[in-house]
Amino acid sequence: MIIPSNSEKFNQDWLELISHDPVHPTIAKESRTAGTRTVLMYDEGEQHQCMICTKVSDDLVRSMKDIFVDSKEEGLTAMFYTIFRLPDALRGVGARALREAVNHFSAQGVKNFYTLSPVPSLRKHFDAPPSEEQVREFIASRQDPVAKFHLGNGATLHAVNFDADSSDIRQGESWGIMVNYRYTV
């Protein structure tokens, strides 16, 4: 079951679980729930399994900086910028949580579903920043764990974004390169 942070059923204490986010650990919990951003808690049975951080936007978002620019109104595009399993969560729960999140936003009239995803193993495979074509080939090879997850769950690579994240983590992993995967309903 998906429980959005703007729901009465969402316990605000759950936001403390954001500290387990391995993708964007430095983003404050308050920033994740402001404007058109929300945190989704995915539960199975009585246990919290997964958290998904999203932004609903009027268009595709191609950088982390733009994730935090508030849209004037909610749009037709859901951007998933963090998805992570919680400690002791079941294996494979991320795929189920993502499907539930798509269903949740579809019911609200959202039509487009994208991620803004890191490529954490990019620097391990290239000595210098790769070209867009090289990134696309690398993603298609599924050697990157994030690519393997999204492509394995039916997404397609939509865009390669250079200078998409200036954080030390992204610079160290991928020269700040991030990608958009697209999920179709």
Please tell me what each predicted stretch does.
Residues 1-91, 95-185:
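Extended, composition-driven regions rather than compact fold-specific motifs
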